[in-house]
Amino acid sequence: VQTGPVVDATTLGASPTIYLNDWRFHIGDAPDANGTGTPSWARPDFDDSQWPVITTDKRLADQGFKQGFPGFCWYRIRIQVPAHANLSVYLADVLSTYQIFEDGVKVGQYGGLPPHERRLETTARAYPVPSLSQPGTIVVVVRVWAHPVQSPPGIEPDSSYVGHSAAIANLRRVYLLDQFHHEIQEIVHAGIDLVMGAVLLFVFLGQRRQREWLWLGLAFLADSVASAVSELQVF
């Protein structure tokens, strides 16, 4: 039994994308999630009627969920699609790794989930929606995991859309361009810290009694290394 939410993508026209805001939501993981088949919670015929409906434009803590819960959570939504449509689902800021299923088929994964955890910087991705010969409904499911230091996991505001594939590609392009500009700024910042740290250590070598130059130089170098390590997680 599925009672919603339902997004009507058959009305796409003047607005080439629709924000996926209302989802069925559940904390925890499917009991068969690490098996060889499709997890039961990812199947289109799974009864999600007892799952609460949440909105991604609000913090989970503001919707009755405790802050700081670690581990897994699941999102489910139904999308009505027209026949022979060229549509895609867009996911951007999802903390921190996830799998996405469309009608029970795993169509993508970002990062690594337990038992093979691999956390990455968030980024935007597009997942094509299956083309149907007749108008119908597909079920999109997102399984999300976050390390306890990053909890709570979940889909951030303004990070989930469905729409014409060309419009979704443009939305992703804009996100990646903004992300690129941010990364350039971080690299420049790391470079400045590196230079400052080296200069301060050089000054310390000439004034060994002034140990504040040593500590300040090491602080700049540490900040530079931390920024560099963070940027290496982006792809």
Where are these regions (language model features)?
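Accessory carbohydrate-binding/adhesion or oligomerization-edge regions at the termini
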Residues: 1-63, 78, 139-177, 197, ...
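Aromatic-lined ligand-binding clefts that engage carbohydrates, nucleic acids, or primary amines
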Residues: 51, 79-102, 140-142
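Short beta-strands within extracellular/lumenal beta-sheet-rich domains
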Residues: 69-82
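Beta-strand-rich ligand-recognition modules
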Residues: 101-157
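Hydrophobic alpha-helical transmembrane segments of multi-pass membrane proteins
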Residues: 189-204, 211-235
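Alpha-helical transmembrane segments and their interfaces in multipass membrane proteins
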Residues: 164-188, 228-235
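Short structured motifs
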Residues: 59-65, 75-76, 122-128
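A short, structured loop/turn motif at beta-sheet edges
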Residues: 48, 82-84, 131-137
